[in-house]
Amino acid sequence: MIRTMFKSKIHRATVTHANLHYVGSVTVDKDLLDAADILPGELVAIVDVTNGSRLETYTIEGQAGSGVIGINGAAAHLVNIGDTVILISYAQMTTAEAREYLPSIVHVDAANKIVQLGTDPAEALTEGLNRPPFSTTA
């Protein structure tokens, strides 16, 4: 059996640009893509923490060190400059692979600079956020 599993995420990034008049996608700082093991053109889910919107799109590599998280095209109707977002990628793997796989978690600050890398999807670094109740990963 092949399962679709959580592969990586850029956690609580700040949207720096929103361009409605673009063909689509999300532009992401190359350093963040590399740290999260996300390739240009890869499918990502974007969860807007600010307003609850969820969408799927593909990534475009942005300038390294720029901190860019740019929402392009129709998604700019759902996600605004200044919103806090989580970019999530998934991968298909066998059950055996899934049981052994460790995801790449990239925690960023308000300027989208990396503050910590990890593998625990339930880890909460932001003040006021807690681990989900009864989560067993540590």
From Swiss-Prot:
Pyruvic acid (Ser) PTM sites in chain numbering: 25
Protein name: Aspartate 1-decarboxylase
Gene Ontology cellular component annotations, sorted alphabetically: cytosol
Reactions this protein catalyses: L-aspartate + H(+) = beta-alanine + CO2
Gene from which the chain derives: panD
One Pfam family recorded for the sequence: Asp_decarbox
Pathway info: Cofactor biosynthesis; (R)-pantothenate biosynthesis; beta-alanine from L-aspartate: step 1/1
Cofactor: binding details: Binds 1 pyruvoyl group covalently per subunit.
Superkingdom of origin organism: Bacteria
GO molecular function, one term: aspartate 1-decarboxylase activity
Cofactor needs: pyruvate
GO-annotated biological processes: alanine biosynthetic process; pantothenate biosynthetic process
Residues of the active site: 25 (schiff-base intermediate with substrate), 58 (proton donor)
Lineage: Bacteria, Bacillati, Actinomycetota, Actinomycetes, Micrococcales
